[in-house]
Amino acid sequence: MKEIEKLKEEYPLLNKLIATEEVFWVNPNMEKYETAIKDSPLNEENVKDAEERLKRFAPYIAKVFPETKETNGIIESPLVKIPSMKQALEKNYEQPILGELLLKCDSHLPISGSIKARGGIYEVLKHAEQLALQYGMLTEEDDYSILDSDTCREFFATYSIAVGSTGNLGLSIGIMSAKLGFNVTVHMSADAKQWKKDLLRSKGVNVIEYEADYSKAVEEGRRQADADPSCYFVDDENSHDLFLGYAVAASRLQKQLEELEIVVDEEHPLFVYLPCGVGGGPGGVAFGLKLLYKDNVHCFFAEPTHSPCMLLGLMTGLHDKIAVQDIGIDNVTDADGLAVGRPSGFVGKTIEPFLSGNYTVSDEELYRLLKELADTEKIYLEPSALAGMIGPVKVCAEDEYLQKQQLTEKMKKGTHIVWGTGGSMVPEDVMNGYYKKGLELIL
């Protein structure tokens, strides 16, 4: 394929990407915040709107999901310091990590146990609100817990929701939609874990399985919705609502950092490492963080060596016009949540001027990191959620990047946040298998 040869000449890093080697890519198209935000299709108002909507729904969430009672129906996760893991990383990789290391435990988000509880649940709630307002079931001034009634469930049962997923988005959309009363179908790709399918079916969700990858599952979900006017399709590749649901995480994180007395400013940079599949979750979170911290936050996406779709799309500038399969990469990885061959064009183009860089990590490395985190901090994440954990090691080793960004002298006063995207709902026997694999790879 001649085009690929041309791309290889233009982007030499592509050779390593094709060889599924671990790479670190600095985004040459990143702009200063004030420039980037001018051309952005989304802004602060959009994120505020999403935040307000989640507040309106909080009484309903607290009522139907008792695990959110303590937080009054706000779906949020802990931010924890992980000093023992930091020491282990420094020792294992022989690389000092300057600054403090924290883990954002979206793995322990209530309801669906992953970052997808942010965007997925938000989009379903927004759709439910629109229908309920349109048909006079609700006004914005109401206590939204009135939606927990047979009348409302019967009303929502006349509508359906569809989504294509590798697993975690399906869990959040499926659980939330079924709770409201919608008929919900999750189209799942070949790499979706069995326990995720079983859990969804136990909640009354219709699960359709495919032998093909994520893109096919999304395509089929879209087709189902197109054929049925009462069916709403959650489009993980193009959804602004999902993106905004994730972006709300930033203001929540800001409060947590303030509670921990962690300063973020020009002298105290913040580095955030986000596992990336199709791009919605990390894209939304990164966008929200840039709105708050502007040029003082540096966001990096992390992808499996066998599914580096966003890195490929950003580096070549082709976005969703190129898939990893086009350059001979198989898109087969144990990091099921990140097993995506073609990135979201909407996310890639939106986040491009805000993103600091992107790197890849091997499955073997994910398992080793999984075991290490379990041993040092007693925190258990699923393999894909560990993709961010190697980020601080990689960034601290990038002297050229740090000097160029005038960060070298500031690193000691900086903060690194690894976004732990999922894991608390993994069945014990499955998690034990992951741990064992990590152990075998270390021995």
Curated annotation (Swiss-Prot):
Its cofactor is pyridoxal 5'-phosphate. The modification N6-(pyridoxal phosphate)lysine is found at residue 116. InterPro entries: D_Ser_am_lyase, Ser/Thr_Dehydratase, Ser/Thr_deHydtase_PyrdxlP-BS, TrpB-like_PALP, TrpB-like_PALP_sf. CDD domains: D-Ser-dehyd. The keyword Lyase applies. Pfam families: PALP (PF00291). It comes from the Bacteria. GO terms for biological process: D-serine catabolic process; isoleucine biosynthetic process. It catalyses: D-serine = pyruvate + NH4(+). Its EC number is 4.3.1.18. One of its GO terms (molecular function) is hydro-lyase activity. Belongs to the serine/threonine dehydratase family. DsdA subfamily. HAMAP family: D_Ser_dehydrat. This is Probable D-serine dehydratase. It comes from Bacillus cereus (strain ATCC 10987 / NRS 248). The lineage of its organism: Bacteria, Bacillati, Bacillota, Bacilli, Bacillales.
